[in-house]
Amino acid sequence: MDNTTEKKEPTKVPRRRFVGKRKTDGKTITTVKADGNEVVRQTKSRVHVGRSLNHIPDDIMEDEELNEAIKLLPQNYNFEIHKTVWNIRKHGAKRVALQMPEGLLIYSLLISDILEQFCNVETVVMGDVSYGACCIDDFTARALDCDFIVHYAHSCLVPIDITEIKVLYVFVTIAIDETHVIKTLQKNFPKGSRLATFGTIQFNPTVHSIKDTLLNDKEHMLYIVTPQIKPLSRGEVLGCTSERLDKNQFDAMVFIGDGRFHLESSMIHNPEIPAFKYDPYNRKFTRERYDQKQLVQVRGEALQVAQKGKVFGLILGALGRQGNVDTVRNLEEKLIKAGKTVVKIILSEIFPQKLAKFDKIDVFVQVACPRLSIDWGYAFPKPLLTPYEANVLLNHDVMFSEEYYPMDYYETNGYGRGRIPEHALVKN
């Protein structure tokens, strides 16, 4: 008897044709089926295309000559030179416009030299005033035959997909003594205080950095909230655009930055919440106040005079991209429908002496900067209304009061964007 056991041949499985890469950074998932067999699946990891495209090459980051040149600039100011060099090279720019506020013009020639040396481009420093992100002047840059513009110290208020040429926004964030900010807030507010904290884009990193530190401090914890009105960054405020806050949810507002212009936007929008300012330059912490009663009185008087007006001068601001053609058209249609005569005017800057020459016009409505009317309206010989105030005049928006005056000009549906905000009574 033959006890030899016949060897069973394993079942042959057809080889799967290999397509693509063998190496993967994905995640392996093993599933056990009811019959006891295991099914192994390899999931693909997410590829962050944007992050890959925006990665600055090592040859730029590690360029010794470039890094030495950057050291000539203030070390606590982040001009993002590496990023700028990379973007200029990537887009193959030949002539680059540099636009910055007056306070930074002192560094413009040094930045110009660096970019010309390491990008092999010609640079043009734009010397006209730049009050904010709304003043980005891609039109003038294009007229100067530039194919790229770097706009400094303001956020991306004007989308880069609608500009005439390639745009790079450099926030110029500024490093400050965060420990002093934290200790100052803890010294001035009781434990557990709820603070709406915000600032200009330069100090946005600090606004976010101190939040976690104060929240996790068991000895003197403070609740820090960084409000956001889209499309602005969280914790960012503009002189014409700020978030409307619930007065029952906050004990105070804290602004980190110098000057009052941007802070006043939040004070006007939220008059019932106490406001404070931390100035990172002189390291002073102050209680700030705004005369909302006077604001309502002055702007109310302007509306009363405007009610009698028959000829309206509709001004399109031409300083950068301050003006919005859609808002002008919308206001023109409403005014004509209300029986008013409309005269359209284009001005880069609006002065009382200039408007005084239009002696046949009864009322002006400016589509440029709402703060021009709010801060300086009393100095003009005729009423100078904002788009919001003009809509109030025509019974298309809610009347302001000592408790509420909207400061949402550049929010997603704001008048500054040619749209109609939520508080409007008529949605067209």
Swiss-Prot record:
It catalyses: L-histidyl-[translation elongation factor 2] + S-adenosyl-L-methionine = 2-[(3S)-amino-3-carboxypropyl]-L-histidyl-[translation elongation factor 2] + S-methyl-5'-thioadenosine + H(+). PANTHER family: 2-(3-AMINO-3-CARBOXYPROPYL)HISTIDINE SYNTHASE SUBUNIT 1 (PTHR10762:SF1), DIPHTHAMIDE BIOSYNTHESIS PROTEIN (PTHR10762). It holds the Pfam family Diphthamide_syn. Keywords: Cytoplasm, Iron, Iron-sulfur, Metal-binding, S-adenosyl-L-methionine, Transferase. One of its GO terms (cellular component) is 2-(3-amino-3-carboxypropyl)histidine synthase complex. Belongs to the DPH1/DPH2 family. DPH1 subfamily. Its cofactor is [4Fe-4S] cluster. One of its GO terms (molecular function) is 2-(3-amino-3-carboxypropyl)histidine synthase activity. Its main location: cytoplasm. Its EC number is 2.5.1.108. Catalyzes the first step of diphthamide biosynthesis, a post-translational modification of histidine which occurs in elongation factor 2. DPH1 and DPH2 transfer a 3-amino-3-carboxypropyl (ACP) group from S-adenosyl-L-methionine (SAM) to a histidine residue, the reaction is assisted by a reduction system comprising DPH3 and a NADH-dependent reductase, predominantly CBR1. InterPro entries: DPH1/DPH2, DPH1/DPH2_1, DPH1/DPH2_2, DPH1/DPH2_3, DPH1/DPH2_euk_archaea. Binds 1 [4Fe-4S] cluster per subunit. The cluster is coordinated with 3 cysteines and an exchangeable S-adenosyl-L-methionine. [4Fe-4S] cluster binds at residues 134, 240, 369. One of its GO terms (biological process) is protein histidyl modification to diphthamide. Pathway: Protein modification; peptidyl-diphthamide biosynthesis. This is 2-(3-amino-3-carboxypropyl)histidine synthase subunit 1. It comes from the Eukaryota. Component of the 2-(3-amino-3-carboxypropyl)histidine synthase complex composed of DPH1, DPH2, DPH3 and a NADH-dependent reductase, predominantly CBR1. The keyword Cytoplasm applies. The keyword Iron applies. It is found in: Cytoplasm.
